[in-house]
């Protein structure tokens, strides 16, 4: 009888172990949704993230879907709705939008840090055509101006704050009619091209302001556009204003993922950075790596975003 009971216990333990393993396998998602912010050339962005897909597919035994949004809002809503699982390069302002809607929606894996000088930030800049007469923001009075996306940090949140302090008013009234028009182009690439083709006298974009000017600096919209099809870009534009340092964007993972799988995703993203850094650089759009980060790094951005939401414009 004792031998029978021992065998029954062993069988029960074996069945329980099999059930636990089956449940763990069932909890492992078969797909991983990688969110990519819009506002850049979609073909290039998807191409730059193919190596990320291949790495995560192999590392996590999943089918990684590249969710390239036409605007920043698509990724924000994807994170809030559980349709986007991980984002490597998130706008701080877009993260603030997620946080203000649901502080527990995502966790910060880390913050992007520049490989060259270990800086943890970048700048919003106003550009004009190199051969234009404009030297300062005041010179753009009465001219057409371009912002990027309403959820962009450097492409709207930061310059909007600066313009309100300098000129008064808001975007809706063109900062007390300082500009003849204020337009959201949809992204940084569109802003730069808008200046080149004469749509805007001035527009905002972003750059690390670290490294070689002629290559578009280590990271930023100039760098991406030069790599794509504008090798002489930096000879065609001129920077007339730059913001104080803005914290680099966070790398995010969704808390909607099962806890065990979420931990694997975080480990895989960090492994991508260290074991295939060239791929990580390609996806980030510049020479960056993952450094430690927390909500505190973005508190000022969150506060500015909250103020903007409460007082639109």
Regions found by a protein language model. Name each.
Residues 80-89, 103-105, 144-145, 190, ...:
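Alpha-to-beta junction loops
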Residues 28-36, 40-51, 253-313:
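An extracytoplasmic/periplasmic, membrane-proximal ligand-sensing/linker region
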Residues 20-28:
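Sec/Tat signal peptide C-region and signal peptidase I cleavage site
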Residues 150-258:
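Pocket-lining segment of extracytoplasmic ligand-binding domains
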């Amino acid at each position: 009888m004792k031998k029978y009971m021992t065998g029954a216990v062993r069988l029960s333990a074996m069945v329980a172990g099999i059930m636990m393993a089956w449940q763990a396998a069932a909890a492992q998602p078969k797909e991983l949704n990688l969110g990519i912010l819009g506002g850049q050339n979609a073909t290039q962005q998807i191409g730059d993230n193919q190596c990320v897909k291949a790495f995560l597919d192999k590392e996590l035994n999943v089918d990684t879907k590249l969710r390239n949004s036409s605007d920043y809002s698509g990724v924000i809503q994807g994170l809030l709705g559980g349709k986007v699982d991980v984002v490597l390069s998130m706008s701080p302002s877009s993260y603030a939008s997620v946080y203000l809607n649901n502080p527990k929606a995502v966790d910060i894996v880390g913050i992007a840090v520049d490989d060259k000088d270990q800086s943890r930030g970048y700048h919003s800049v106003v550009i004009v055509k190199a051969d234009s007469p404009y030297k300062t923001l005041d010179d753009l009075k009465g001219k057409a101006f371009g912002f990027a996306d309403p959820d962009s940090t450097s492409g709207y949140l930061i310059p909007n704050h600066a313009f309100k302090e300098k000129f008064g008013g808001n975007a809706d009234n063109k900062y007390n009619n300082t500009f003849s028009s204020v337009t959201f182009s949809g992204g940084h690439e569109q802003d730069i091209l808008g200046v080149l083709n004469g749509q805007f006298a001035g527009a905002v974009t972003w750059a690390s302001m670290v490294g070689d000017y002629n290559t578009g600096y280590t990271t930023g919209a100039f760098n991406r556009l030069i790599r794509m099809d504008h090798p002489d870009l930096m000879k065609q534009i001129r920077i007339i204003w730059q913001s104080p340092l803005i914290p680099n964007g966070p790398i995010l993972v969704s808390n909607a993922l099962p806890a065990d799988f979420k931990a694997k995703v975080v480990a895989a993203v960090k492994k991508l950075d260290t074991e295939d850094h060239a791929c990580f650089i390609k996806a980030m759009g510049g020479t960056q790596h993952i450094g430690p980060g927390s909500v505190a790094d973005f508190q000022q951005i969150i506060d500015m975003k909250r103020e903007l939401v409460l007082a639109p414009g």
